[in-house]
Amino acid sequence: PPPILVGHSMGALVVQRYLEQHPASAAVLMAPVPPQGLWPSTLRMAVGDPLLYAQYGLMQAFGSGMIDTDVAQRAIFSEQMPDQALTTYARRVQRESQRALWDMNVHAAGRPWLASKSVPLRVLAAGDDALFNLEETRAVASLWGCGWQSLPGMGHAMMLEPGWQQAADTIIRWIWEAG
């Protein structure tokens, strides 16, 4: 049988591209890049949280050694993330590929008209996502004409959060219900 696909953020964009050309049994897009690309969220971050915006720029230019863990927490985790885990994950952050950043800006919108309409699809949002807000995440579900759900209290990296089991259970339950 075709695979069940789960993609997060940029990986959700990869899943959308896959669906344009290949069958799948089901797909879940977790905190996906919005159809408008990164520009709206980047602008919102630059105006609303300039320190966070500056930290992203420093990290992109110089790597994880420039990351302030408090800012990293605001960026991708909820307030519930334990300090030790936050420090461990912050050290593992790497610069994004310039090509990938370009693709997420210029080619961010999936092309659902190319995909099979029979693939059950679900969009999962993180309620406290500083990168992609609920409206932007909902736009992905609207584009694909599929269901959408928000997990309150979760940061962008919901699969690493202390409450990751809630995200996993939500996905598993939906896959079973989708058949």
Per-region residue spans from a language model:
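Active-site nucleophile elbow and catalytic-triad environment of alpha/beta-hydrolase enzymes
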Residues: R92-L114
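Short beta-strand immediately N-terminal to the catalytic nucleophile in serine-hydrolase-like folds
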Residues: L5-G7, M30, L124
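Flexible "cap/lid" loop of the alpha/beta hydrolase fold
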Residues: S25-Q60, A100-H107
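Conserved alpha/beta-hydrolase "acid-adjacent" motif
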Residues: A130-A139
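Conserved alpha/beta-hydrolase catalytic His-Asp/Glu region
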Residues: S64-A100
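Gly/Ala-rich beta-loop-alpha elbow adjacent to hydrolase catalytic centers
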Residues: V6-G11, V15
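Short beta-strand/loop motif that positions the catalytic acidic residue
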Residues: K117, V123-A125, D129
